Amino acid sequence: MFTLKKTLLLLFFLGTINLSLCEEERNAEEERRDGDDEMDVEVKKRFITGLIGGLMKALGK
């Protein structure tokens, strides 16, 4: 029983470190891609406008 607890504690500890490192790497990548956010906003606006236009055509108005 003690060995199982020890193993589970070790796995939990290593998993926590791994998640922390991945989160730091993801944050660094997001900081590098700051310019892409403006492009994403434009694409979302076009998508919403196209979606509304398509719904209006489908409804026949």
From Swiss-Prot:
GO biological process, one term: defense response to Gram-positive bacterium
Swiss-Prot/TrEMBL keywords: Amidation, Amphibian defense peptide, Antibiotic, Antimicrobial, Cleavage on pair of basic residues, Cytolysis, Fungicide, Hemolysis, Secreted, Signal
This protein's record includes keyword Nucleotide-binding: no
Residues that bear Lysine amide: 61
Principal location class: secreted
Tissue: Expressed by the skin glands.
Keyword flag Hydrolase: no
Maturation-removed propeptide residues: 23-44
Stored InterPro entries: Frog_antimicrobial_propeptide
Gene Ontology CC: extracellular region
Pfam families, per the entry: FSAP_sig_propep
Function: Antimicrobial peptide. Active against some Gram-positive and Gram-negative bacterial strains. Active against fungus C.glabrata 090902 but not against C.albicans ATCC 12231. Shows very weak hemolytic activity against human erythrocytes.
Family, similarity comment: Belongs to the frog skin active peptide (FSAP) family. Temporin subfamily.
Name of the protein in question: Temporin-SN2
